[in-house]
C-alpha cells in the first residue's frame, strides 16, 4: 500500500498534522523531495514539534522514517533537528531513521550563495523570496554534478577528497568573482564532512532497496511531501517555485522506488491560502471581498 500526502496550494496547508494523524496506520513514512526550507508543525501531548527534514512519522515509535534520494540535506540542520527531538523524548536511531545514500548534501557554501544572490537581486527588486537555506543551489549543483551526496560520507577516501577539491575550485570562481567573498577552504569543508560522516554514516543506506522489500512484504508506506503543488518546479507558478517536484507523481521516484505505483494520493488544502516564502499573490481578490473574508 503506497500512499502520498501532498499539498495542493503553496505549502503551509497542514500536511504535517495529517501525516501525524494518519501515520498511526502505516509502517513507514518517507520524504521524497525538498530540504529544510519549510517546516511541518505537529502538536501533541508531548508538546510542539517543528520538523524541517525528518518525516513527521518520527513522533510515532513504531514507524520507520525515510529521507529519500530526491531530498537535499543540510547535515548541520539535521543534527540540530535530531537534538531538538531527542531533548523532548523522541527516540531516534538507525532503526527508525534511514537516510538515502543518493540524497544531495547542502554544503555551507550553498547556504552562503543563496543569501548573497538574494541580497544582490533585492537591489533591483528582482529577488525570488528565497528562504536562504541553499536549496536552489544544492539542486543546481546536483544537476551540474558539482556536489557531494550523503553516500560520500560513508566512504571518506581520497576519491571523495579529490571531488571536493574540484567542487570547491569551481565554487570559488563564483564566490570571489561575482560576490567578492573570500575563497572557500577545502580543508574546512573536508573537516565539516568528516564531522558529519562520523555522526550520520550509521543512518545512510540504500533506501530504495529497503522500501522495495517493505512493499513486497505488504508494509504500508506513506510519502510525505514538502511545500505544495503550486511550488513545484515544473507545475508551479514559475519562477516563484521551489527547486524540486512537489507533486505526488514524483513520490516513488524521489523516495527511491521509481518502478512502483501509488495506490492512494491525498491532497491537503485549507479554507484560505497562505504560503512558504515570498512571491506575487497571483489570485489576490478585490479589497471589499478581502475585507469580508478576513472578518
Listing of model-derived features with the role each one plays in the protein:
Residues 1-100, 104-107, 112:
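Basic, polar low-complexity surface loops/patches
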Residues 15-17, 40-44, 109-114, 143-145, ...:
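Short acidic, glycine/serine/threonine-rich loops at helix termini
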Residues 78, 82-210, 221:
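Internal alpha/beta core interface subdomains
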Residues 197-226, 231-235, 280-283, 289:
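Accessory "access/gating" subregions that flank catalytic or transport cores
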Residues 292-295:
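Conserved small/polar residues in nucleotide/adenosyl-binding loops
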Amino acid at each position: 500500500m503506497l500512499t502520498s500526502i501532498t499539498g495542493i496550494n503553496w505549502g503551509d496547508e497542514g500536511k504535517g498534522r495529517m501525516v501525524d494523524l494518519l501515520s498511526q496506520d502505516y509502517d513507514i513514512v518517507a520524504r521524497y523531495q525538498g530540504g529544510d526550507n519549510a517546516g511541518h508543525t505537529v502538536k501533541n501531548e508531548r508538546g510542539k514539534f517543528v520538523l524541517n527534514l525528518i518525516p513527521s512519522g518520527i513522533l510515532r515509535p513504531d514507524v520507520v522514517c525515510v529521507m529519500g534520494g530526491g531530498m537535499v540535506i543540510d547535515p548541520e540542520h539535521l543534527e540540530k533537528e535530531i537534538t531538538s527531538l531527542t531533548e523532548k523524548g523522541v527516540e531516534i536511531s538507525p532503526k527508525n531513521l534511514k537516510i538515502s545514500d543518493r540524497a544531495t548534501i547542502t554544503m555551507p557554501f550553498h547556504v552562503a550563495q543563496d543569501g548573497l544572490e538574494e541580497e544582490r537581486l533585492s537591489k533591483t527588486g528582482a529577488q525570488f523570496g528565497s528562504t536562504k537555506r541553499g536549496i536552489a543551489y544544492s539542486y543546481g549543483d546536483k544537476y551540474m554534478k558539482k556536489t557531494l551526496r550523503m553516500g560520500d560520507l560513508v566512504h571518506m577516501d581520497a576519491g571523495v577528497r579529490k571531488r571536493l577539491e574540484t567542487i570547491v575550485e569551481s565554487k570559488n570562481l563564483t564566490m570571489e568573482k561575482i560576490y567578492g567573498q573570500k575563497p572557500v577552504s577545502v580543508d574546512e569543508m573536508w573537516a565539516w564532512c568528516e564531522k558529519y560522516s562520523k555522526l550520520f554514516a550509521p543512518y545512510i543506506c540504500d533506501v530504495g532497496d529497503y522500501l522495495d522489500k517493505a512493499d513486497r512484504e505488504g508494509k504500508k508506506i506513506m510519502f510525505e511531501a514538502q511545500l505544495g503543488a503550486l511550488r513545484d518546479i515544473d507545475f508551479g507558478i514559475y519562477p516563484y517555485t521551489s527547486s524540486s517536484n512537489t507533486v505526488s507523481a514524483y513520490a516513488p521516484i524521489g523516495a527511491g522506488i521509481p518502478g512502483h505505483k501509488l495506490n492512494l494520493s491525498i491532497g491537503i488544502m485549507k479554507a484560505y491560502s497562505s504560503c512558504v516564502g515570498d512571491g506575487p499573490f497571483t489570485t489576490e481578490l478585490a479589497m471589499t471581498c478581502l475585507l469580508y473574508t478576513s472578518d
